[in-house]
Amino acid sequence: MTYTGLMQASLDSGNIQDGSYIFEKMKDICAPNLVTYNIMLKAYVDHGMFREAKELFEQMLENTNHLSRNDDYKMRVIPDIYTFNTMLDACAAEKKWDYFDHVYQRMLYHGYHFNPKRHLRMILEASRAGKVTFLFFFLHIMNDPL
């Protein structure tokens, strides 16, 4: 059985602490891949552990700051669209609009784009919370042909 399988089994049974422990121990033996990071991130979010999810996400973002050679892509895990969507959902659920903006800006920086079906609900929630700049920014994006 793999570390990811053990971690997933712990998380599926609702045991976040054991899943997190396995994830951390895995780093001592082998490098977790993107799927493993996303599984752990989603588990933190699903169990209301926003701070832990944010820390893990920031670790992934930090990895992108250390990419200088092609070989670095094999050793470091960088966020994908699933990672960004998971964090955007978490920010919206927790009403962390300033961090939502940070995550969204990083998503754009990494080459992922606004998805009206996926993100519009969150943008409207942010604008209702007084983050009017989000609404204007996204309306501009939607009206700006590529």
Question: Which residue ranges define each predicted feature?
Answer:
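Inter-helix linker motif
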Residues: 14, 29-30, 48, 64, ...
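Pentatricopeptide repeat
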Residues: 3-4, 8, 19, 33-38, ...
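The core hydrophobic/aromatic register in alpha-helical repeat solenoids, strongest
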Residues: 6-14, 20-26, 41-48, 54-60, ...
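Acidic/polar low-complexity surface segments
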Residues: 60-68, 72-74
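Intrinsic low-complexity, intrinsically disordered segments enriched in polar/basic residues
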Residues: 64, 134-145
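Histidine (H) residue identity feature
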Residues: 47, 66, 102, 110-113, ...
